[in-house]
A protein has these predicted regions:
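Charge-rich, well-structured scaffold segments of protease-associated domains
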Residues: 1-10, 29, 84-235, 301-329, ...
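Cationic, low-complexity basic patches in intrinsically disordered or flexible, solvent-exposed regions
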Residues: 336
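His/Glu-rich zincin catalytic helix
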Residues: 1-87, 108, 192-298
Length: 340
């Protein structure tokens, strides 16, 4: 028994980092010009398929346009209702995720390989033939607006938005955020306009990973790679402006009924291509990126101020931030700043 249970008083030996290879995708240009990136790895019969749209929030004409154009893809096509789409994906054990970012939109499908031809056909119909029905749009907008109103009262959301405003500037795309009234301005015309401009074979890239068989590749080529689809036209590149920091070093947001404080500290870091990026990433991890990090052992374990403290790097197009964040009680807020 003593040989099985380790002596917790003795630190385990330190070992060097094992060498490993990062697998690079095989790239195929399909007949319609779309790029397909393939990573064939794993033994389980599971496939992840990603369609990445090369346009996002920086391309929208009004707030929330990119998000809802993406979100509404699953709400109906000319041949399937939203209920039928959900029922079919559920029947075949598939999972679908729709999301958008500053400069991209994403359609992600997880599927068993044996049903992949069926499930990717559903996704292809959603992407190529979305209709943006009025009734479903209103339901989706109302639900998202309600979630926004709830989140807007959370101190962590308030601090996250404010630190972006201070670092980037309130008129910068990364410092501006949707307001409640922006949800009321969304209509099908706006979404169809964004969909028509950016959801086409000339502005999308495909990624597939898992146990990628010849049949999986044939299904992708059949549903996405033969002919051009959508209103193919050149998409003008949009560059983010330079950040315009406000210069304030300490910002306080008052919320009288809050039970906790959310404290965020941040600054600009070198971007991914910089020679010091990886060293700084390791340093940030040592500071607050894992359970035994400096912030965790000092503020949580030693001082007992909180269960939740961390530091990490956040990458945006053209900018990288290093952020430290914590939730604490008001009584310990001022003490904590000096310790961090």
């Amino acid at each position: 028994m003593n040989n099985i249970i380790p002596d917790r008083k003795i630190m385990p030996p330190l070992n060097g980092m094992a060498e490993f290879d990062i697998m690079k995708p095989h790239v195929e240009i399909m007949p319609n010009g779309m790029k397909l990136n393939v990573i064939d790895v794993g033994t389980e019969d599971v496939i992840r398929f990603d369609l990445v749209i090369g346009s996002g929030q920086i391309n929208q004409s009004v707030p929330l346009q990119a998000m809802f154009a993406n979100r509404m893809l699953r709400e109906g096509t000319r041949s399937m209702t939203s209920a039928l789409i959900a029922e079919k994906l559920d029947y075949y054990g598939a999972w679908l995720d729709l999301s958008s970012s500053v400069n991209c939109g994403f359609v992600t499908l997880y599927s068993l390989g044996k049903y992949f031809d069926t499930t990717i056909a559903i996704v292809a119909d959603m992407v190529k033939d979305a209709v943006f029905p009025e009734r479903e749009l209103q339901v989706v907008v109302d639900a998202n607006k309600q979630q926004y109103l709830v989140n807007a009262q959370r101190v962590d959301v308030m601090s996250r938005k404010e630190i972006n405003r201070v670092l980037f500037g309130r008129n910068h795309p990364l410092g501006k955020f949707a307001e409640a009234e922006d949800y009321d301005r969304i209509d099908t015309c706006l979404l169809k306009d964004f969909y028509r401009k950016y959801y086409h074979s000339g502005n999308c890239t495909l990624y597939v990973s898992g146990r990628v068989t010849g049949g999986v590749l044939d299904s992708i080529r059949k549903h996405f790679g033969q002919e051009e689809w959508g209103c193919v036209s050149p998409v003008k590149a949009v560059a983010l402006p330079e950040p315009c920091p406000e210069g304030r070093k300490r910002v306080f947001l008052e919320k009288a009924d809050a039970m906790q404080c959310s404290l965020k500290m941040g600054l600009f870091f070198p971007e991914r291509g910089h020679e010091d990026y990886h060293d700084l990433r390791v340093m940030t991890t040592l500071l607050g990126g894992y359970f035994g990090s400096r912030l965790m052992s000092n503020i949580r374990e030693d001082k007992g101020y909180t269960y939740g403290i961390a530091a990490g790097m956040v990458s945006y197009p053209g900018a990288t931030l290093m952020l430290s964040l914590i939730h604490i009680s008001e009584l310990t807020r001022l003490q904590l700043i000096s310790y961090a």
